[in-house]
UniProtKB/Swiss-Prot annotation:
It comes from Burkholderia thailandensis (strain ATCC 700388 / DSM 13276 / CCUG 48851 / CIP 106301 / E264). One of its GO terms (molecular function) is nucleic acid binding. Its main location: cytoplasm. It holds the Pfam family tRNA_anti-codon. It catalyses: tRNA(Asx) + L-aspartate + ATP = L-aspartyl-tRNA(Asx) + AMP + diphosphate. Disulfide bonds: none annotated. This is Aspartate--tRNA(Asp/Asn) ligase. InterPro entries: Aa-tRNA-synt_II (IPR004364), aa-tRNA-synth_II (IPR006195), aa-tRNA-synth_II/BPL/LPL (IPR045864), Asp-tRNA-ligase_1 (IPR004524), Asp-tRNA-ligase_1_N (IPR047089), Asp/Asn-tRNA-synth_IIb (IPR002312), AspRS_core (IPR047090), GAD-like_sf (IPR004115). HAMAP family: Asp_tRNA_synth_type1. The gene is aspS. It is an enzyme of class 6 (ligase).
Length: 600
């Protein structure tokens, strides 16, 4: 008989009366009245093994096994006794009467029980091998595998070719910091790990491969958050001779296919499309969570002439904004709740949080409760009530500052209230999946520190045709042929139509204050390729980690990556990064500079 004939979790009634050989780990060992029960676990689940004292040698072995021992069991599949069926297990109607028990490897006492749901992330990541044995982690990584398989199936059916691109490439810092790799044979020179395969996939389009994809690692040396890792995985795609709408349709279908085939979720038949300007105006975010039924009300123009300087000053400032957020039934929020929200918005740069409770709208000023009402004239109050549509029992929150501060703070407050227990109880948030496309992004953003424009996405994104003239006259007016797919407030994919003409790419570099010599040094290979009849092309990249995190309902992408890094970009399992010896550094022509000691 083979070492293993069946997986533990797949032993069911169809094997009744048969002898099976199982391998796995001891989840739990119980001694009941002289009979030993072992819950045996493998990747497919659990099966109950019964060890009877009639088989003395086997029973003696069973008495010595402990949790996480790796064992082999040979035995007879039989029905469980009446009243002992476990409906929660696929194998819950049967058990295996053990004939032979072999310890394949003993285990020291684990540092935690695998069913402990209150482990710290540090403990889990330090003992990641044991953490990965837990059913939820097994589920997450198998879900990840299925998502990748379904993406490959779809792309294969659509004529895409899987082509690998280099991991050791050229550093072209235009965004996040690169991870650098020193070259031993080229002293003083460095490779960079790719932040994306962007330029190589464009070159593949010039090379007539027409449709490319790759599920690949990307690397960015940036500060980490719950949805970031220094190395992450993209479903990276590029296609020739398709316009923006056609590209969106193609990959919208892919995401629908993946959700249906992996978790049996039917996404919208057609995703809504929202311009960036509308998303920022209504939600203060370019990745709005449409499950939350709260929206901003624009008040900037109505607050220009009020005596209340908190509102009028930003209303009359070039980059200022005044916006309101009406919360239905919010008048029941306590002063403690409001104080908590006030402290919360300070995280995003807000200096405070103004509010008005609407007790009786018909009474006008006298029906309102607020510390700011005395600073507003009747016309301003009427404008606020009219524009927000506030009703009796509502509360209206206000933000007034630079537009970025208003958008960030009020946008975060919108999500916090919507997803709170109050929000759920009052129908301010829906369940389910709310996808959309956000389009027409600004081509450039102005960097005050560098006193120049920088690319909002990357410098290879095509401007909209009607905005080409602005590249040399007013870059800030340029909109890009860029698009992000957003799902429940997460950007799960982003892409654009690319620049395929060398003269346009050179104009974009000039708008970014990248001179001809610098452009040739950094991107000469691209500029050269674009001169050989480069086709119109565009693409998109999806964050595999993010998609699986959402599907699994996980708190962090670290829960869907086998061996992730911490928020300090460290691997607690292997203790990477770590020092290297002096000999290796000499071979790489590197001398470390010791950090300066603080002066006493």
């Amino acid at each position: 008989m083979s070492m293993r004939t069946e997986y533990c979790g797949l032993v069911t009634e169809h094997l009744l009366g048969q002898t099976v050989s199982l391998c796995g780990w001891v989840q739990r060992r119980r001694d009941h009245g002289g009979v030993i029960f072992i819950d045996l676990r493998d990747r497919e689940g659990l099966v109950q093994v019964v060890c009877d004292p009639d088989r003395a040698e086997m029973f003696a072995t069973a008495e010595g096994v402990r949790n996480e021992f790796c064992v082999q069991v040979k035995g007879l599949v039989r029905n469980r006794p009446e009243g002992t069926v476990n409906a929660g297990l696929k194998s819950g109607k049967i058990e295996v009467l053990c004939h032979e028990l072999t310890v394949l490897n003993a285990s020291v006492t684990p540092p935690f029980q695998l069913d402990d749901d209150n482990l710290s992330e540090t403990t889990r990541l330090t003992h990641r091998v044991l953490d990965l044995r837990r059913p939820q982690m097994q589920h997450n990584l198998r879900l990840r595998y299925r998502v990748a398989i379904e993406a490959r199936k779809y792309l294969d059916e659509q004529g895409f070719i899987d082509i690998e691109t280099p991991m050791l490439t050229k550093s072209t810092p235009e965004g996040a910091r690169d991870y650098l790799v020193p070259s031993r044979v080229n002293a003083g020179q460095f490779f960079a790990l790719p932040q994306s395969p962007q330029l190589f996939k464009q070159l593949l389009m010039v090379a007539n491969f027409d449709r490319y994809y790759q599920i690949t690692k990307c690397f960015r040396d940036e500060d980490l958050r719950a949805d970031r890792q220094p190395e992450f995985t993209q479903i990276d795609c590029e296609t020739s001779f398709l316009g923006e709408q056609e590209i969106r349709d193609l990959f919208e279908d892919m995401i629908r296919h993946i959700f249906k085939t992996t978790i049996d979720v039917e996404l919208d038949a057609k995703f809504p499309v929202m311009p960036y300007s509308e998303a920022m105006a209504r939600f203060g975010s370019d990745k709005p969570d449409l499950r939350v039924k709260l929206e901003f009300t624009e008040l900037t123009d109505a607050m220009k002439d009020v005596d209340f300087k908190v509102f009028s000053t930003p209303a009359n400032t070039k980059d200022g904004r005044v916006a309101a957020l009406r919360v239905p039934k919010g008048a029941e929020l306590t002063r403690g709740d409001i104080d908590g929200y006030t402290e919360f918005v300070r995280i995003y740069g807000a200096k405070g949080l103004a509010w008005i409770k609407v007790n009786e709208r018909a009474k006008g000023r006298d029906g309102l409760q607020s510390p700011i009402v005395k600073n507003l004239h009747d016309a301003s109050i009427a404008a606020i009530l009219e524009r927000t549509g506030a009703q009796d029992g509502d509360i209206v929150f206000f933000a007034a500052d630079r537009a970025k501060v208003v958008n960030d703070s009020l946008g975060a407050l919108r999500l916090k209230i919507g997803h709170s227990e109050f929000g759920k109880a009052n129908g301010l948030v829906e369940s389910g999946w709310k996808p959309l496309w956000v389009v027409d992004f600004p081509m450039f953003e102005y960097d005050d520190e560098e006193a120049r424009y920088v690319a909002a996405h990357h410098p290879f994104t095509s401007p909209k045709d009607e905005h080409l003239e602005y590249l040399e006259t007013d870059p800030g007016r340029c909109l890009a042929k860029a698009y992000d797919m957003v799902l429940n407030g997460w950007e799960i994919g982003g892409g654009s139509v690319r620049i395929h003409r060398e003269e346009v790419q050179s104009k974009v570099f000039r708008a970014l204050k990248i001179g001809p010599e610098e452009a040739q040094a950094k991107f000469g290979f691209l500029l050269d390729a674009l001169q050989y009849g480069a086709p119109p092309h565009g693409g998109i990249a999806f964050g595999l980690d993010r998609i699986v995190t959402m599907m699994a309902g996980a708190d962090s992408i670290r829960d869907v990556i086998a061996f992730p890094k911490t928020q300090r970009a460290q691997c607690l399992l292997t203790q990477a990064p770590s020092p290297v010896d002096e000999r290796q550094l000499r071979e790489l022509h590197i001398r470390l500079r010791q950090p300066e000691q603080p002066k006493a």
